[in-house]
Design a protein with these regions (language model features):
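C-terminal, charged and often intrinsically disordered regions of DNA end-processing helicases
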Residues: 1-78
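Active-site-adjacent bridging/hinge elements
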Residues: 14, 39-51, 100-101, 168, ...
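Glycine- and acidic
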Residues: 18, 22-31, 50-60, 76, ...
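Secondary-structure capping and boundary motifs in well-ordered enzyme cores
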Residues: 25, 33-41, 58-69, 91, ...
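Short, well-ordered alpha-helical packing segments
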Residues: 34, 45-49, 71-78, 127-130, ...
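A non-catalytic, helix-rich entry segment at domain boundaries
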Residues: 72-150, 154
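Non-catalytic protein-protein interaction segments used by genome-maintenance enzymes to assemble
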Residues: 142-211
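Short glycine-/polar-rich loops that comprise or flank the Walker A/P-loop
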Residues: 214-215
Length: 215
């Protein structure tokens, strides 16, 4: 029996639901709010339908993988109580000692054939970033560092959670929230200048709700 060709129906740009989606009372984060505001279809697929992308990283996902590994480098470095007393050379020496073990346990795809350029790029950028960040922390008078700080609060009536990459306490007890990104352009600097860095704004609100003073 010959079947006539039937083209697939066109995909609509907008899908209207018959009734509002119940989001429940689960705490929201910057990631979920950013999806809700800027990509609501993705938000519904992930947060309502429960669909999740694979957690497996491939060698092609350079920025995502390198960013995760760089976060781990600074988390491990600042886990040392004397991190702020290290010279740049000492800190870079520590990284060179630890890098191989980190790649073996958490970044094995960078050890695969063909990933040598990405691996060397990762090492070079981390060494430069370690020295640069330590210079900034010293000049600011940093006295205490906390990594991966979990905070909770509210945004209006919505429960809000966040995890700050690096929370710095200065000599005058003021705090600074740092969010580390792996990209070399001016995208995030532009957001800061324009007052549009939503992630840091949310973190600032959470810190103020927790400590009583904005960073």
């Amino acid at each position: 029996i010959a079947l006539a060709h039937q083209p697939l129906p066109p995909t609509p740009r907008v899908i209207e639901l018959e009734k509002p989606v119940n989001l429940g009372d689960a705490p929201q984060s910057y990631t979920t709010l950013n999806e809700l505001f800027n990509d609501p279809v993705l938000f519904v697929l992930k947060r309502v339908a429960g669909l999740e992308p694979t957690p497996v990283l491939t060698a092609e996902e350079d920025n995502r993988l390198l960013g995760i590994l760089a976060h781990r480098v600074f988390e491990k470095l600042f886990a040392h109580a004397d991190a702020l007393t290290l010279t740049n050379a000492q800190a870079v020496g520590w990284f060179r000692t630890e890098a191989d073990a980190l790649l073996l346990t958490e970044g094995a795809v960078l050890l695969m054939q063909g990933a040598g350029v990405s691996q060397q790029h990762f090492r070079k950028v981390c060494e430069s970033a370690i020295g640069s960040l330590l210079d900034h922390l010293r000049s600011a008078g940093a006295t205490q560092l906390q990594t991966e700080v979990d905070l909770s609060g509210t945004l209006g009536a919505v429960p809000l959670i966040g995890k700050i990459d690096l929370l710095v306490t200065l000599g005058d007890k003021r705090t600074v929230a740092l969010d580390m990104k792996w990209r070399g352009d001016n995208f995030y600097a532009s957001l800061l200048r324009l007052g549009e860095h939503l992630q840091l704004a949310l973190y600032s609100s959470l810190i103020e709700q927790t400590s009583g003073a904005a960073p």
